[in-house]
């Protein structure tokens, strides 16, 4: 039987979370152990502008950006600071896809952090739903590899405007939006197409029809 995943990057959604909580150090280690090609992780700010690895932008309708890291840790003890992640994880040998969450100021603080600590960004991609994030990073350092995450199906002229302006390496679509015209257009411009999030292998017969480059997945597969 043909391997449906042969040419697709396996992207561990918030790490491999079958046995550990989302965005935890243990989930990131498991993604390596189970040989995922890339790890997707979410980052945002607390109220003191610490960069945390965390997905949800509110906790019981209180915005995370109004809470301290200590408050968040009391409810979610596995929450990591980005600084701790870089100290404890061999990020130079793993492809990382950062999903930027929250307000616009995240990118300024992130850029300053990467410069201050001389972080090797060779295996890093920075992506967001928020074009303000992409715009800032593009101007701060043209060498940043950027991605657009979207629930929108743009017309080709709008997508052309976006990829002409920004150094977009991939576009990650919600899986229901896949269509041949957009995938072919992106490939013709040397831009990868990713989809999110594979939660059930029953989706594969549909996804495999498209010549995409990567799947953000909760599921381990061979």
Where are these regions (language model features)?
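Phosphate-group recognition and catalysis centered on beta-loop-alpha active-site segments
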Residues: 1-222
């Amino acid at each position: 039987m043909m391997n449906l995943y042969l040419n697709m990057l396996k992207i561990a959604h918030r790490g491999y979370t079958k046995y550990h909580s989302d965005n935890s150090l243990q989930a990131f280690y498991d993604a390596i152990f189970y040989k995922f090609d890339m790890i997707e992780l979410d980052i945002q700010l607390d109220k003191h502008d610490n960069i945390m690895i965390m997905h949800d932008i509110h906790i019981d309708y209180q915005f995370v950006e109004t809470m301290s890291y200590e408050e968040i840790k009391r409810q979610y003890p596995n929450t990591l600071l980005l600084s701790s992640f870089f100290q404890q994880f061999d990020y130079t040998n793993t492809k990382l896809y950062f999903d930027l969450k929250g307000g616009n100021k995240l990118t300024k603080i992130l850029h300053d952090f990467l410069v201050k600590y001389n972080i090797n960004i060779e295996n890093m991609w920075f992506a967001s739903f928020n074009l303000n994030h992409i715009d800032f990073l593009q101007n701060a350092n043209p060498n940043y590899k950027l991605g657009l995450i979207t629930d929108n199906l743009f017309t080709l002229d709008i997508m052309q405007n976006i990829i002409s302006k920004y150094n977009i390496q991939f576009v990650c679509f919600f899986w229901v939006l896949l269509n041949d015209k957009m995938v072919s257009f992106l490939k013709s411009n040397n831009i990868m197409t990713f989809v999110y999030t594979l939660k059930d292998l029953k989706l594969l017969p549909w996804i495999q029809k498209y010549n995409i480059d990567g799947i953000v997945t909760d599921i381990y597969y061979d």
